[in-house]
């Protein structure tokens, strides 16, 4: 086996190969032999994915990439060769369904039937039933997976499907389960789990229903994949942007700060590997395991575990003090090659990609979980029969589980013991806080009884509020149990809802409920017996206005009754019908033979102020188009719209100046006359177009296209008198008869004069003006009105309407009608929807037709209907006859609602002013009578459920309310209980009548979000964007002792925290929030008082305010930030871990560092900062130290948490920020502030087109800094990343910094010796490693200071003189 000869090695491998499952061992041996000189050890072990992974990792670590690649290639060839030889393949016969499946399904069905029964008896709510069903199927599914594994393992270990899934080659148990177990539960598109599971698998085949349900999940998977890919890409972009300028720029920042990595269950896993220790690590025996700055490899990590170390302090990017970068030692190993990271490595980009990339994987894992799984808690069963004892420490409170089981929850940690009845050793169980107990203290229990469900630590699960409707299964009357205590709640909009305050039942007592039609009134009183067919209620339909009845033929389900309210016949007009080629035209002819053309046709409907007919009148018709002018005196009525013309209010004269307008739109080559030429009538102006009048022609053209030709008729007179020409320039003027127009030009008639320039010369055009006289009133025969004392009235009025407004030019060749005389309908006191019908009637005297206008009231009368589940049968009777005259308010028809089955009528309690909309008949089938065999234990009005006892040994097998007890006979009205939980919204009130299918209540409950990456990616985004969640948990602001009191209303609670200095802070907690603390508990700042998602900003504030009282500002800020950072890192890790994605902590730390690096200035003190400005914490620290030395006031600040988008936009580089988002805003602000970009990150340099300061470009960056530092290289010793870029430093180490006037004049020597500096440092307690001496202030003389201000601070002078740094002068 270990022979070095290749031939023997090959043959020996071949002889082993035929042992099926051991085929892959040879892989390890061959591959390993190629790499090592010594013969490898023989390992008899099945090689699966995990072993292969470790093997490749080992080879890579010890032998490099080339050898590993060759080995992997050999392994691949080997695998394929033996797979071919063994003929591994998959066929349908390989899919073997375990026999245990049917039994498991049977057990699940039994459990669910029992749950349904509990629900029917009103012991659990609809939500609890749903949860229980889903959990039952989830558990069954898990058990079936185990059965599948067991079946393959025992009966067919070499099954191809099993080998494939088990070795990690392809597929996983979740997929194998669907092939041979059961497909399981599916979710609908809203993400709710459907409680009908898919019981079959793909081997057996799905039923149609199951196929349709399972296609939900498939669709969801596809859509999710598409959406999440985009989301994940955008997340990566934001991460890259926030961290792109984090580059390793220093060897060692020299920090003493560190983070503690604690062991989980005594194991560190990979969490320490690649880190450097921040201090000497010693074990319990004081033995040094590692010095400071020792890189931790897997062996050292194991050594720590073996020494039972609970935690190790390591260096981390979170605590690195390198300005805006990370040093090599804080970052640790670069995970690509497990060596210390190189200088110039762009670790920010690596971190961003490491976090963003798994986002796409997360997406693919849609929902493998069956919803709410209870796997996080362990169930403890009794191992013996005996008596339960809680012990003296125990404190428990009542609790209802999500499955509706009444249990007790532990409020403290305690030990529970079961003392055996037969004597012997008791069973001890540790009960941690929050665990559920299903037994009582002192209870005797049997062996294998569920005692408790142990809580696995306080996991903050993400929950969401959800609602579920409770739908009524039978018609009947609603009765509340008094325990519900409903109360009315008014929301912000003023809507009132009824809410249950306690857990209790709503009962629906059976009966036949009748929905009454609108305006129906009961004709029977309550508690009266009725027979089948008896009238229960009556609805009547009455006429509103009265009039003559017309009965129409019935249409569909109803019959129309028309009542003629008002009618009017136009007796003065004959109605004539004329046939034309376009159809029938109707005319009205008056006695003076004037004709009106009818605008409507008989049989149609018209409304108020609509035109009935128009006068056919040629008196106001023109021959051509032209210009219209109103003479003074003619007035029109003001109207909203001029759609129907302008109504004349006072008659007068209308002036008309004819003008012929031809609209052409042809090429100019077709023009046959000249512009402004005089033409005669009949002249061809354009090909095939002739002028109808004589006059001067005006041609309008554009881009060689003829638009219009206008002919202005009249007489043309040449005129040289410029005064006259100027007078009639433009639109011209109207001149009356007999007036002199110009020298030698006079007119006999009214004309319009205009100056015109023609080819012959300038002159005046005298255009004739036609006058139309309009009377004040339209000339019409007598019109009459029909007035009624009550109800609508009718009338006809005449109106004259002008079609055009004053000064309007009508472009036309044909004539137009200037005035229309119209007959209009006028109605009074009508409702808007009331219309007038136009009818034709015969005049008996003159044998002609007349026009009749009729106002109708239409009433739809219901036809008889047969009964259905919610309505009784109805019978409708008409109370009128055709042509009968009825008065207003007379009944036209009555509808009777008839009883379906005999029984006793009950009317609901009348609510103020509301009519009765439903009534109920209690039938014989709604009650049962029970013969009691002994003394009755029940009372009248008591409600009972299945299994309750009538007498000592006799139980009931129905639910309902006891109506009557007569001796031994007990009458029970059947009913159905529905459990409602506290805070449910009640849709019905006590005593209401409901139909089957009505909603009774809306249950409000909290459910866990499905443990699924669909929650994962948004959750990561929520964390990294530092979003403020809705309904966040209430956090404790200061440390202290808890005191819980009742609030003002019954169910609210006030939690008071009593601090050490006896200050009390109160936190009112609303109904529906779970309090997470108990009385007398000690809490620290930032601890949860209620459940819910945490608001990270609030958490940071809590940490900071608490620490601010105990520590200096800088320390408080750093410690608060550190606490928050630790929490953020673990939250992000939890999401990825739950999906099985491994990301190294340091990547998340780099991003979190960027999110928490800034502080908000509250008070600038004597620094140059502005209040509200966001500044790097390190920069504030340096400035404050410098200011405090010069005696100025340091700035006050609060730490802030920025989401990744905000952090990217708040970066110092405006080029980077502008290329990310909100380009215009960022650039504008940068321009206004006169910012400089120091091109530190990668993005800025790429955009500018320079070499990036990372990788090989890093050395160039360092050289540039050295050149800049010039004569003061020691500046770089203190600031190796060159962050100050010596931008505002003068060669003599000074910066102008405003400070207090006194401090301004304190003399500081320019270049003190190193010893002098050292002495001053020790005197003022300055740490040279953290202080930036380049930022020390230099004195500046200020002429504006008073003599007093110019005086130096005596104390400061004395100090400097003592040090010998200042001469006596």
From Swiss-Prot:
It comes from Prochlorococcus marinus (strain NATL2A). It catalyses: RNA(n) + a ribonucleoside 5'-triphosphate = RNA(n+1) + diphosphate. Zn(2+) binds at residues 253, 320, 327, 330. Belongs to the RNA polymerase beta' chain family. RpoC2 subfamily. Residues 1342-1351 have a biased composition (Acidic residues). It is an enzyme of class 2 (transferase). Pfam families: RNA_pol_Rpb1_3, RNA_pol_Rpb1_4, RNA_pol_Rpb1_5. InterPro entries: DNA-dir_RpoC2_beta_pp (IPR012756), DNA-dir_RpoC_beta_prime (IPR045867), RNA_pol_Rpb1_3 (IPR007066), RNA_pol_Rpb1_3_sf (IPR042102), RNA_pol_Rpb1_4 (IPR007083), RNA_pol_Rpb1_5 (IPR007081), Rpb1_funnel_sf (IPR038120). Residues 1-26, 1294-1369 are annotated as: Disordered. Residues 7-24 have a biased composition (Basic residues). Its cofactor is Zn(2+). This is DNA-directed RNA polymerase subunit beta'. Its EC number is 2.7.7.6. The keyword Metal-binding applies. Residues 1357-1369 have a biased composition (Low complexity). In cyanobacteria the RNAP catalytic core is composed of 2 alpha, 1 beta, 1 beta', 1 gamma and 1 omega subunit. When a sigma factor is associated with the core the holoenzyme is formed, which can initiate transcription. The lineage of its organism: Bacteria, Bacillati, Cyanobacteriota, Cyanophyceae, Synechococcales. Binds 1 Zn(2+) ion per subunit. GO terms for molecular function: DNA binding; DNA-directed RNA polymerase activity; zinc ion binding. DNA-dependent RNA polymerase catalyzes the transcription of DNA into RNA using the four ribonucleoside triphosphates as substrates. GO terms for cellular component: DNA-directed RNA polymerase complex.
